[in-house]
Amino acid sequence: MGMTPTQRATLEDVTQFIYREARLQDEHQYDAWESLWADDGVYWVPANGDDIDPEQKMSIVYDNRSRIALRIRQYHTGKRFGQTPQSRLRRVVSNVELIEDDGKEVRVAANAMLFESHQRGDVVWASRNEYTLRREGDDFRMVLKKVVLVNNQSALYSMAFLI
């Protein structure tokens, strides 16, 4: 099924937003990354599948906006042992799909591959990311970012950064 010109424009806008979000994370610009979040934003990395209830089952990450801010403050202390020295990161985002647009919020999904290089070794993290983005002026704010890791049913030995 084809897209309308409005849908194509929306998809281009949200794709650029997601690319910017990925770049900010890769460059460890976490204050700027934090500014992309809505006040009621939720950051969720489920464990053991992708269709669980995060209120009932364990998650790798299930953070509200204040917890996101706390993680960033902790990172800035320089005392995050897992990130000393800092990992070098690079994400590749692809297959961005417009799922729903109700005029106020846009739901999109994308595939992502993250390469992490650290003194303990290199790791590749693969995921399907789902976003709910709220329109705010000419930009968006993240209301939900759900990162479904391909291997989220396996032991994850180190994830000392915000994926």
Mark where each language-model region is.
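Short, low-complexity N-terminal intrinsically disordered segments enriched in polar/charged residues
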Residues: 1-39
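A generic "alpha-helical surface" signal
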Residues: 12-16, 59, 66, 124
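Hydrophobic pocket/interface hotspot
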Residues: 21, 33, 68, 108, ...
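Short helix-to-loop capping/linker segments positioned immediately adjacent to catalytic or ligand/cofactor-binding
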Residues: 21-23, 79-86, 118-120
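A beta-strand edge to alpha-helix "cap/lid" segment located at domain peripheries
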Residues: 90, 97-163
